[in-house]
Curated annotation (Swiss-Prot):
Na(+)/H(+) antiporter that extrudes sodium in exchange for external protons. Also shows high Ca(2+)/H(+) antiporter activity at alkaline pH. Does not catalyze exchange between Li(+) and H(+). Residues 1-18, 63-94, 148-164, 216-245, 298-311, 371-380 are periplasmic. It comes from Aphanothece halophytica. GO terms for cellular component: plasma membrane. The C-terminal tail could affect ion specificity. One of its GO terms (molecular function) is sodium:proton antiporter activity. This is Na(+)/H(+) antiporter ApNhaP. The gene is apnhaP.
Amino acid sequence: MTIEAAMGEEAIKENLEQFLIVLSVSLGVATLSQISSFFRQIPYTLLLVIVGLGLAFVDIRLVNLSPELILEIFLPPLLFEAAWNIRWRNLKKNLFPVVLLAIIGVVISVVGIGFSLNYFSGLSLPIALLVGAILAATDPVSVIALFRELGVGERLTVLMEGESLFNDGVAVVAFSLLVGIPLGTQEFSVTNTLIQFVTLQGIGIGCGGVIGFGISYLTQRFDLPLVEQSLTLVSAYGTYLITEELGGSGVIGVVTVGLILGNFGSRIGMNPRTRLLVSEFWEFIAFFVNSIVFLLIGDQINIRGLADNGQLILITIIALVIIRAISIYGLGTISNLITKQDISWQEETVLWWGGLRGSVSIALALSVPVMLDGRQDIIEAVFGVVLFTLLVQGLTMQTVIEKLGLIGDRAQRRTYSELIARRSALERVLAHLNAVPPSPSIRMKSLKTTKEASKGQLESRQTKKLRSYNNSYPQLRSLEQEQLRELTFKVEADTYAELIRAGKLNNNLSPLLQEVLAKPE
């Protein structure tokens, strides 16, 4: 064996060991946070950062990835999963405020944070603007989970999810346009920047659209869940790489293909079981990638450097909070003046305080070129902001929602659903008892007693509880109708999809059928 071959094998072995360490530690910590009642109170992402810091403190470095690889590995799955899960039908109703917050909001964040850091911390303007672009990307995953737990209104959830999805893409484009300025590889020009921005966006949307619709129609031709699941993974990474090669924004391409496959392809080309399989697959992928990213940021931090940059971190946090408030309340007012659906000041406050920073900002910070002076300052400033948003904003979010009176009726709806389920179960029990044939092993008296007991429980206890709930919470009366309506939409959409796959219905659907296929799950 040659020396080169031996060195190559040793490098592969070392990289594999590093990967297995990262895999074991990240999933181990994430799992611990779910099974322990004490750790369950702490966001698992925060636990991962703490473990990463601990490993860095004892000088155990987990893995060394090039900045380019960090973006190519971590961004596509995070963005695709977010785009796959957002429902276009809901997003379309709030598209204007979402786009306003995502595009103009990113510009305000980049300029506001950049000039604030330049003025108050002495950071050079190109580096400060780069920090602003990195921190323009919001990542409210834990806040959205809290929304669903507390029953916060659907519109507020869509606004926050939609803003996060689109501003991630815009922030990454802004980052790619600004990162060359401090390196001296490009000069800033408003005209050239706008042209480049439109070009990146256009190529990204075009590539994502072609690949998304192509895979959507391809999956109509077969019913192989694992192949369809694999195609979504290939589409996420493939779209990113192809779009980047063509000179566009891979991030915008991934967001586009995710929206198309999640809202169109999953309807016309996948049966319900496959859709569930793919959704669960991407839920795991996002969980896994988030785990690794938050572990790596802790691993990359220099403890002494973090303490030395305390003033820079504090200035960055203050600038971020103030600029975010200006952006949300200002753009919210503009949106209210133009659209008919007002965003209340309570909702604006939640959007402001819930704009956490997370995986995308961390991935961008870690992807800053190594040769750039001030790279470590950027990483530590971003880490400080992410830590603040997780610890302070994330942990106080429930209190803010409660004080603003935005908690919905989720708990009552859950109890009401359980009562309906109990009633259905008792009805099935009665139907089964009525169908029991005479048998020597079953005493008729016992059977009759059991029937009467079940019937009495159904007619008195369950009926009284449901009536009481209906009187106490009138808004719950439509719950059964909502569930039935959603069920009929699912059955109807699945029937059309089956007919299309069987060749009994034309691919070119009428607007009516397209609307049915676009109904949310």
